[in-house]
A protein has these predicted regions:
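Chalcogenol-based redox active-site neighborhoods
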Residues: 1-190
Length: 190
C-alpha cells in the first residue's frame, strides 16, 4: 500500500454521475477540483451492504462539506449507468437516493491502482479516503478493509484540522476539534 500523503493526487478522467444527476462521459478530477479542497472516497461496489450506509451518511453531511469548500467524489469500479440506477433506487429498496456528490466510474480499475486501493482478490476498491488540499496535494489518507465502514464525523474533523492549520499555521493535537486551540510546533513538548 502506497503512502500518497505529501504527494500530488493522481488525476483521472472517467465517466461519472454528477451530484445533480447529470451523466457525463468525461469527468475530469483536476478540472472539478482545481483550487478547491477535495475528498476522494473509494468504496467496493454499488448495490451492496456497508457501501450504502457510508454513501448515505456522506450525503447527509454534504452541507458541511460544501460550507467548507470541499468537492466530494465517490469512486467504485461500477459503470456510470450502474451508479445512476443505484441513485434512482429508493433507500428502502436498497438504493442510495439522489446523493449530491459526483460518483466516478472506474471501470478499468486505473484510479484504484493509481491510489493503490485495489483489493486483489476480489478486484474491488478498499474503503480508501483521501483528503486533498487546494494545491492538489494529498494531506490525509486512510484505507479500511472491506467490512469496516468509515466515520463521517472524523472526516469532517480532518477537513477542519487541515483548514485550521492552513489559516493559523498551528498544529492540531490529538483529539482536536473545530473551536479548540491549536499549538505551535515546538521541541519543548506539550
Amino acid at each position: 500500500m502506497s503512502v500518497l500523503v505529501g504527494k500530488q493526487a493522481p488525476d483521472f478522467t472517467v465517466p461519472a454521475v454528477l451530484g445533480d444527476g447529470q451523466i457525463v462521459d468525461s469527468f475530469s478530477f483536476s478540472s472539478a477540483t482545481r483550487g478547491k479542497y477535495a475528498v476522494v472516497f473509494f468504496y467496493p461496489l454499488d448495490f451492496t451492504f456497508v457501501c450504502p450506509s457510508e454513501l448515505i451518511a456522506l450525503d447527509h453531511r454534504m452541507d458541511e462539506f460544501t460550507s467548507r469548500g470541499v468537492e466530494v467524489i465517490a469512486v467504485s469500479i461500477d459503470s456510470h449507468f450502474t451508479h445512476n440506477a443505484w441513485r434512482n433506487t429508493p433507500v428502502n429498496k436498497g438504493g442510495i437516493g439522489a446523493v449530491r456528490y459526483t460518483m466516478a466510474a472506474d471501470m478499468t480499475h486505473s484510479i484504484c491502482k493509481d491510489y493503490d486501493v485495489e483489493a486483489v482478490p476480489p478486484g474491488v476498491a478498499y474503503r480508501g479516503t483521501f483528503l486533498i488540499d487546494r494545491s492538489g496535494v494529498v494531506r490525509h489518507q486512510v484505507v479500511n478493509d472491506l467490512p469496516l465502514g468509515r466515520n463521517m464525523d472524523e472526516l469532517i474533523r480532518m477537513v477542519d484540522a487541515l483548514q485550521f492549520h492552513e489559516e493559523h499555521g498551528e498544529v492540531c493535537p490529538a483529539g482536536w476539534n473545530k473551536g479548540d486551540a491549536g499549538m505551535n510546533a515546538s521541541p519543548s513538548g506539550v
